[in-house]
């Protein structure tokens, strides 16, 4: 999904505990268990992306979950490629 010249990256896209039917876009083997907004922000900074954070929003299909927020990443890359890079970087941060 695009927003103002960028890609919207919801935490759900990277979360291995969320089924694909609820919004995860990565294979479970490449996804991350319960990523936080701060981890994703650190990963984006390490990867050198420009972004904007929206902390007060919830993913529509999972409106009842506590975790919230999304990030608009300024890139022309496909969303899946971006999500793979970010998930890999989050895994590196957790080591």
From Swiss-Prot:
Pfam families: SRP19. One of its GO terms (cellular component) is signal recognition particle. One of its GO terms (biological process) is SRP-dependent cotranslational protein targeting to membrane. Keywords: Cytoplasm, Ribonucleoprotein, RNA-binding, Signal recognition particle. It is found in: Cytoplasm. GO terms for molecular function: 7S RNA binding. Its main location: cytoplasm. InterPro entries: Signal_recog_particle_SRP19, SRP19-like_sf, SRP19_arc-type. Involved in targeting and insertion of nascent membrane proteins into the cytoplasmic membrane. Binds directly to 7S RNA and mediates binding of the 54 kDa subunit of the SRP. Belongs to the SRP19 family. Part of the signal recognition particle protein translocation system, which is composed of SRP and FtsY. Archaeal SRP consists of a 7S RNA molecule of 300 nucleotides and two protein subunits: SRP54 and SRP19. HAMAP family: SRP19. This is Signal recognition particle 19 kDa protein. It comes from Pyrobaculum islandicum (strain DSM 4184 / JCM 9189 / GEO3).
């Amino acid at each position: 999904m695009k927003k103002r010249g960028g890609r919207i990256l919801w935490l759900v896209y990277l979360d291995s505990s969320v089924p694909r039917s609820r919004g995860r876009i990565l294979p479970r083997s490449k996804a991350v268990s319960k990523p936080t907004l701060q981890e994703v922000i650190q990963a984006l900074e390490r990867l050198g992306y420009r972004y904007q954070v929206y902390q007060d929003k919830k993913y529509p299909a999972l409106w009842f979950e506590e975790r919230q927020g999304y990030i608009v990443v300024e890139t022309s890359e496909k969303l899946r490629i971006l999500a793979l890079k970010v998930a890999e970087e989050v895994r590196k941060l957790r080591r």
